[in-house]
C-alpha cells in the first residue's frame, strides 16, 4: 500500500517478537523500501537500555535494497514535554517518535494531556507524535493539529490502534486526521508492528483517511523521498545510501 513504515518494535522491547533481520526479510518480501525501528524509550519497564539506541550507529543503512532508519518511540514524561531521549541518543537517531504510555505518564484530564503533548511538539526534539487518538488520553484535537503543523511535527494514525490496542480510537483518529487536513499538517502512518508479519499493514489507517478525504500529498509514507525530505527539513543529514531508494 505504502513503501514506508515508521513505527515498529523488535525483541529489544521484550513484549515484541521479531528481530531486525526478520523485518528486513519481510520488507523485501512485501516491497517496503524504507522502515524505522522504533523501540520503546528506556523509561518503559521492558524497554532497552539507552546504550541500545546509542549503538544503532553500527547498523548498516541499506540491506538487500531496504533502507533502515534508526528510531525510538520515546515516552512523554510530564507537562513540560520532556521525553526519555537525551544526550548521545539524539546523535545516533534519525527519527524521534513520542507518545503517551501509562507506565510513564498516567492519563490526565484533557487540559493536562493537551498541555503535555503541545509542549512535546514545541520542544523541537520530536518528529512524530504516536497514537494521538488514544481514547485514554483525551486532547484538544484542533489545538494539537495546529501546533503540529506550526512546528513541522507529524501526527500518527496507528494501525494497531484499531486491531490490538487502544480500542475505541476510531472516532478520535478520524478527528485527528480531519484536524491535520484542515491545519495543513502532516500525517504519518505506523503499523506499530510487534511482529514482522504486520509490517506495512495500513489497512485500517486507510479507512480513517478515506473517511475524511485526507490529501495524499500530506502523508509522509507515500515515498522514501518524501519522508527523507521531511526529516532533512528538520535537520537530519542526508544519508548517501538512501539516494537509490
Curated annotation (Swiss-Prot):
Keyword Metal-binding annotated: yes
Annotated GO biological process: bacterial-type flagellum-dependent swarming motility
Binding site for Zn(2+) 2: 15, 40, 194
Species in which this protein is naturally found: Salmonella schwarzengrund (strain CVM19633)
Name the record gives this protein: Probable phosphatase YcdX
Taxonomic lineage of the native organism: Bacteria, Pseudomonadati, Pseudomonadota, Gammaproteobacteria, Enterobacterales
EC numbers, comma separated: 3.1.3.-
CDD domains: PHP_HisPPase_Ycdx_like
Record note on quaternary structure: Homotrimer.
Cofactor(s) this protein requires: Zn(2+)
S-S bridge residues: none
One Gene Ontology term of the molecular function aspect: zinc ion binding
